[in-house]
Amino acid sequence: MNEAVTIRGKERYKSGVMEYKKMGYWEPDYEPKDTDVIALFRVTPQDGVDPIEAAAAVAGESSTATWTVVWTDRLTAAEKYRAKCYRVDPVPNSPGQYFAYIAYDLDLFEPGSISNLTASIIGNVFGFKPLKALRLEDMRLPIAYVKTFQGPATGIVVERERMDKFGRPLLGATVKPKLGLSGRNYGRVVYEALKGGLDFTKDDENINSQPFMHWRERFQYCMEAVNKAQAQTGEIKGTYLNVTAATMEDMYERAEYAKELGSIIVMIDLVIGYTAIQSMAKWARKNDMILHLHRAGHSTYTRQRNHGVSFRVIAKWMRLAGVDHIHAGTVVGKLEGDPATTKGYYDICREDFNPMTLENGLFFDQNWASLNKLMPVASGGIHAGQMHQLLHLLGEDVVLQFGGGTIGHPMGIAAGATANRVALEAMILARNEGRDYLHEGPEILAKAAQTCTPLKAALDTWKNVTFNYESTDTPDYAPTPSVSV
């Protein structure tokens, strides 16, 4: 099964149809070079299709192959440019599925272009008939390729300096309801939340420029709220102004206006596409702005474990592309997030080097070559009563966004913000004192609530509310003595 079967010489270029594994796309003896891009695919062949042939077909169709032999291959350095599948393993506990390791020569990709990379890696091959399903699980991006990208426009260190916030997670909230508010009422929500103790507020993914609130009106009221809250609290505040629009010209216009109004941060949605994301990241770097990315739409291709693209790959692409914030899961919230898998996402965002960690879904070592770090964002169904869990699981370099957990507070928005700020600072103090804050968390919160009525109301309202559903995306690996959960 693992023997090389490549046909070489004149027979290799004889007209007609030839199996991919015989065309040079299956090379089990190949040793990947340090400069190779490596992709790990989960391949589910159609019934009766040889898994080696299926994996070789993925290599071929994502690089130089077509359905028949073409003599023009001989006009190229074909041996170099063919992607090479060098390893195929059965997926543990998933009959009929296989992990295929495929190496691509670096010269196959345009430097610094996510769009070009994805056109090959997740292009036509995902519609290939011999496959029931195909998922891109992970990638190893060589240093030589990583260095062609800008990376996060601002980075965690500079963002903290700009915000003058150190030693704790940043706090935020998404304005609710996400649609329907007038500009004046929208700005009021922003002001109350920032005045109450949050660092950021945020537009939601689908608030752009609708009949009930034009984008310019929203920007004006929001920045009036930010400036007023800053003056009252003496702290630097921000609000993510969503500049997502129909064209790049519109997005640049909105971003420039946000900058003119004094905003330190703008926001875009993942659905604008890779080229637009990189374009906005370059604008943000040039204009000293923090760039927040809402991952709107990602679950259409990241959530199912047998088909699509893993979010760990999206996180890698977005760190290359140059965003400063990305929603990366909450573990304890309402949105998809297996704890081990989510830790892998956070490590991709925040570490200079990611070692292979199979239990967290990281299949390769990844060196980030001094690219800035990307701030992960946790949002969706979290509240003050989970603060000890959030700090333990996600660390301090994270934005914790309590939308409903702020705006849904029974005493009002400002009280909701205060409850979250007091809960966080109580937990940070306990951590700094060396206490076992994870296990003592409820006790720490209860004590803090004795002198903070808003926190007591939050704990009484949401109690132990959580969303314990089984994750659809968990790591697949075979446990060994050196790799155990």
Swiss-Prot record:
Binds 1 Mg(2+) ion per subunit. CDD domains: RuBisCO_large_I. GO terms for molecular function: magnesium ion binding; monooxygenase activity; ribulose-bisphosphate carboxylase activity. Keywords: Calvin cycle, Carbon dioxide fixation, Lyase, Magnesium, Metal-binding, Monooxygenase, Oxidoreductase, Photosynthesis. The modification N6-carboxylysine is found at residue 202. Belongs to the RuBisCO large chain family. Type I subfamily. The basic functional RuBisCO is composed of a large chain homodimer in a 'head-to-tail' conformation. In form I RuBisCO this homodimer is arranged in a barrel-like tetramer with the small subunits forming a tetrameric 'cap' on each end of the 'barrel'. This is Ribulose bisphosphate carboxylase large chain. It comes from Rhodopseudomonas palustris (strain TIE-1). The lineage of its organism: Bacteria, Pseudomonadati, Pseudomonadota, Alphaproteobacteria, Hyphomicrobiales.
